[in-house]
């Protein structure tokens, strides 16, 4: 029956997403509904403002990131969205002179604060593992689940992405099955940056794995 929902990148609505009001977000949700679409949620969260950062050791910058994250939760909920895909690779990189464990704790602190608001409004933060060539933090589902456990909130879960999983040593069906307790959202984008089935990845085993864990949420095509 075609596409049933749409994901929105906040910076495509306004150059500074902090200026998006809840009323404007509600109108976007209504516009989508009038076209027969549900706003699934948001992605590309920290593209703008460009200085926001998940693992930063700057306390003020971390507070800014928390405030911005809570704002995104509010506009996501106002649109009727239920999920926020947290990728933003450059805005989570760990500097070589930082202690990785301390950086991970800082990330957990940011996400814990935002997740409080998310849980209140029925939104899930879906943390996205990404390939090593994109970022040096959260490069596997396993590493990301470790962070999710540290956050310890039902509103902070896992997002899986076919392109990113293709960079892991484990097979994609294996990752799906091993992560099944945490998966909140799924992107079926091919490593060739086009749609599913246009490259070398075989999607039948992926679909079978999703069915085997009884995944019943959206599968988004990111191209």
Regions found by a protein language model. Give the residues of each.
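Short loop/turn segments at strand-loop or loop-helix junctions that form parts
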Residues: 44-47, 87-90, 223
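Short acidic/histidine-rich active-site segments
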Residues: 216-223
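Acidic/histidine-rich catalytic cores of soluble enzymes
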Residues: 5-6, 11, 102-209
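Glycine-rich tight-turn/loop motif centered on a GG-T
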Residues: 56-62, 93-105
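Active-site groove signature of glycoside hydrolases
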Residues: 76-97, 121-131
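N-terminal pre-domain/capping segments
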Residues: 1-82, 112, 119, 153, ...
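Proline-centered loop/turn at the N-terminus of a beta-strand
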Residues: 38, 82-83, 124, 155-157, ...
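Hydrophobic residues in well-ordered beta-strands that form the structural core
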Residues: 8, 39-41, 85, 127, ...
